[in-house]
Amino acid sequence: MAAVSAKRTLTVLRETFPIQGTFRISRGAKTEAHVVVAEISDGGVVGRGECVPYARYGESLDGVVEQIESVAAAIGAGMEQEELLSALPPGAARNAVDCALWDLACKLTGQPIWEVADLDAPLEPVVTAYTLSLDTVENMAAAAKASS
């Protein structure tokens, strides 16, 4: 892992991205994605991680921002991934901070993630899920065919 500076800072941002068309699932529809971004700066180098809070899991934008902000002092003191596991519960906030820490480590060392994570070789991407927006049968069939 990269050497830890005592001058790290954590910044939390909210971003909104439009979605092409309307994305519908059984719990509702949306035309934009609300994203929380965690940025960890160390000597001018910035690691970035993001997350999308889901009400289904008891998360909200405000709650996730508060969770991320609650570890700002620990990040400033050099918190790494291992300590993060006990500092935040599993969920969107921890994901954003964890990704920012990994991104920062890669940028500080100039190494790709697989080397920083001490893997033998890069891993191939794996599709773990694919969600189709609710629509007519014909449109859903066309979307499924286009994605396969």
Placement of each model-derived feature along the sequence:
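N-terminal capping/lid subdomain adjacent to the active-site entrance of alpha/beta enzymes
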Residues: A2-S148
